Amino acid sequence: MKKSKLVVALAAILSCAAIPTTVMAESNVQQTMEKSNMSEAKKDLHEIYLAGGCFWGIEAYMERIYGVEDAISGYANGKSDKTNYQKIGITDHAETVKVTYDRNKVSLDKLLKYYFQVIDPTSVNKQGNDRGRQYRTGIYYQDTADKSIIEKEITALQGKYKNKIQIEVEPLHNYIVAEEYHQDYLKKNPNGYCHIDLEQANYVIIDEKDYPKPSDAELKAKLTPLQYSVTQNKNTEHSFSNEYWDNFKPGIYVDVTTGEPLFSSKDKFESGCGWPSFTKPITKEVVTYQDDHSFNMLRTEVISRSGKAHLGHVFDDGPKDKGGLRYCINSAAVKFIPLEDMVKENYGYLTNAVKE
C-alpha cells in the first residue's frame, strides 16, 4: 500500500495552474503546505515485521488497522540476503509483512494484540491451510527497545494457552520485498485465497492501560459533586433532566473518571426511561457487572472496567432485534465526545464504531 503525499499534489496543482500567481495565492499555498508539513511532523512512524502464514492475508488485515500507514509483503530472517517466492523453502525465509505505523495513533503492544487475533500462536510452521517453514509465525524488530514490549505481550499471550507459544521473536535480518505480484494481492484479487477473516480488523481493541484510574483526591478535584456521587457512591441522577438523555448526535460516551470509551451513539436508542439507553457497550470488555440488591430489588449493576465507576444498570427490556438489552446509564457517569472531535481527542480509532 503506497500513500500519496499532499505536498506533491499541491506542487502538481501549482505547476498546472492557469491563473496568475498573486501574493494572496502564494500565502494560501504556503499556509496549506505548512499545515501539511506540520501534520507530517506530528507522525511518529515506526516499523515492525510480522510473519503469520500467507502474507496476502496479513498485509490486507494490517492495512485495515487504525494507525497503520503502510504494509508491504516480503521475506524475512532467512539464510541469505537474496531469495524469491520459488526459493524461500531453500533460503528459509518467512513470508513477512513490513508494517509501518504511527505511534501517535497505535502503540506496538496494541498492534501485536491485533496480530494475535488472526494467528494460531501455538502452531509450528502452519497457519490455516498453509504448511511449511515459510509459514511460521514471527515478530522481527529493528529497534532493540521493541524487544521488551514484544516479550511482555508474548508472556501475556502465553497465559491464555496451555501449549507453548511458538512465535519466533528475533532481530530482523535479510528482509527482501516480495515480487510486485504479491503486493496488495487481495485488492487485485478480491476473491483470492486468504486464511484469515479480514473482518476481525473491525473488532476494536480498547486497551485498559491507556485509561488509568485517578486517585480519589484527583477524582474529587476533577469531578462535579454529582459526578462523584454517582460514580463513586452509586447514586442515581434525576431522569429527564440529565445532560445526555435526549442527545442523539453521533459520537462516543466515555467514562467520566478515566476517559475509557464505553458506548457509541450508534447503539443509543429512545427508551422512554429518561436516562441514556444503549443496546450494548462498544466492546464487551469495557464494562463489568455485579448484582445490586439495593432498595429491596435485584438488579445488575454496570461498572466501568478501568475506573471501577458506577455507570447504571442493565435490563432485559431492550429492543429484541438488537439483543434485548437496555443499558440504562447515568449522564453524570459519562462524557460525550462528538464524532467531529474524536480524532482531536485521540479517539480516532473508534470512528468506525460510530458511523452507521
UniProtKB/Swiss-Prot annotation:
Q: Enumerate the Gene Ontology biological process terms.
A: protein modification process; protein repair; response to oxidative stress
Task: Identify the EC number(s).
Answer: 1.8.4.11, 1.8.4.12
For this protein, the record's Pfam families field holds: PMSR (PF01625), SelR (PF01641)
Q: Which PROSITE patterns does the protein's record reference?
A: MSRB (PS51790)
Q: Which residue intervals define the domain MsrB in the entry?
A: 216-339
Q: Does the keyword Oxidoreductase apply?
A: yes
Q: Which SUPFAM superfamilies match?
A: Mss4-like, Peptide methionine sulfoxide reductase
Q: Which reaction does it catalyse?
A: L-methionyl-[protein] + [thioredoxin]-disulfide + H2O = L-methionyl-(S)-S-oxide-[protein] + [thioredoxin]-dithiol; [thioredoxin]-disulfide + L-methionine + H2O = L-methionine (S)-S-oxide + [thioredoxin]-dithiol; L-methionyl-[protein] + [thioredoxin]-disulfide + H2O = L-methionyl-(R)-S-oxide-[protein] + [thioredoxin]-dithiol
Q: Where is this region: Peptide methionine sulfoxide reductase A?
A: 46-199
Molecular functions (GO terms): L-methionine:thioredoxin-disulfide S-oxidoreductase activity; peptide-methionine (R)-S-oxide reductase activity; peptide-methionine (S)-S-oxide reductase activity
Query: Its domain of life?
Result: Bacteria
Top-tier EC class = oxidoreductase
Question: What does UniProt list as catalytic?
Answer: 54, 328 (nucleophile)
- GO cellular component annotations, sorted alphabetically? cytoplasm
What role does it play?
Has an important function as a repair enzyme for proteins that have been inactivated by oxidation. Catalyzes the reversible oxidation-reduction of methionine sulfoxide in proteins to methionine.
Kindly give the PANTHER family that the UniProt entry links to this protein.
METHIONINE SULFOXIDE REDUCTASE, PEPTIDE METHIONINE SULFOXIDE REDUCTASE MSRA_MSRB
Q: What is this protein called?
A: Peptide methionine sulfoxide reductase MsrA/MsrB
**Species the sequence originates in:** Aggregatibacter actinomycetemcomitans
